[in-house]
Amino acid sequence: MRCPFCSCENSQVKDSRPTEDGTAIRRRRQCEECGARFTTFERIHMRDIVVIKKDDHRQPFDRSKLIRSVSIACRKRPVSPDQIELLVNSIQQKIEASGESEITAVRLGEMTMEGLRTLDSVAYIRFASVYKDFTEARDFEDFARSVRSVIEAVKE
């Protein structure tokens, strides 16, 4: 495995274990050249999933793009990278379990919002603001108000 710090090809596996949800193997590695430690994940590749965009063009599902989007929404929030990884794993498992090889970007966005809603309400609102293309402060206010009323209803 190539070291992300010095690009050396030789690294040694220091620890290997399955992830919490059992969908991957997490490996802690140490570069034999610079000594840096890094983590890799090994996953089973089920099938190629295609995302149908709003303009009808198709592109391969990009797990790292979804992780980036969720990470941006969760920035400076009490959400760990492991929680983000679990959320994305859950979404990907649901897509694969559906048996379909294609999913609309709309459905993918909805699934992501569903997961974020239970994870962190601020991250949920941040993601929704981009996904739903809020154009005015009022859009934020209305959405935040609806989220607040749902949270209060759940608490009662």
UniProtKB/Swiss-Prot annotation:
GO biological process, any: negative regulation of DNA-templated transcription
Keyword Transcription regulation set for record: yes
Cofactor note: Binds 1 zinc ion.
Species annotation: Zymomonas mobilis subsp. mobilis (strain ATCC 31821 / ZM4 / CP4)
A molecular-function term among this protein's GO annotations: DNA binding
Protein name stated in the entry: Transcriptional repressor NrdR
InterPro entries xrefs: ATP-cone_dom (IPR005144), NrdR-like_N (IPR055173), RNR_NrdR-like (IPR003796)
Domain ATP-cone, first and last residues per copy: 49-139
PANTHER family to which the protein is assigned, alphabetical: TRANSCRIPTIONAL REPRESSOR NRDR (PTHR30455:SF2)
Keywords attached to this entry: ATP-binding, DNA-binding, Metal-binding, Nucleotide-binding, Repressor, Transcription, Transcription regulation, Zinc, Zinc-finger
Keyword Cell inner membrane: no
Cofactor(s) essential for the protein: Zn(2+)
Start and end residues, zinc fingers (unnamed): 3-34
Function: Negatively regulates transcription of bacterial ribonucleotide reductase nrd genes and operons by binding to NrdR-boxes.
Recorded family membership: Belongs to the NrdR family.
